[in-house]
Amino acid sequence: MKKNNFNIVFFFILISFTLNVKANDTLSIGKDIFLNKAVCSSCHMLEDAGSNGMIGPNLDQIRPDKNRVMMTVKNGIGIMPAYEGELTSEEIEAVSIYVSTVAGN
């Protein structure tokens, strides 16, 4: 019985660690896209990224949720171009998770 309890606890710790690593990887990938691939930082201010763009909205102030970021990145808005076709759906999701997680924090 003790061995089964140990196995169960170990399994949950392993899953928690794996999920945390995956979340950190997604944030790192999203930040890289924000800074280097889509170069969102040239227009947007986001403290976590160290960006101070003055053209687009200050993302720390508006604190957009993931869906809002995804729709805006996919379709563009105002002078911001659409990135659907430029970024993969996985990249759009990663940058959306990154921005919605760190904005205003």
Set out the residue ranges of the language-model regions.
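N-terminal export/targeting leaders of redox proteins
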Residues: M1-N24, N105
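Gly/Gly-Pro-rich "capping" loops immediately C-terminal to redox-active cysteine motifs
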Residues: K31-D32, S41-I77
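C-terminal capping alpha-helices of c-type cytochrome domains
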Residues: E86-N105
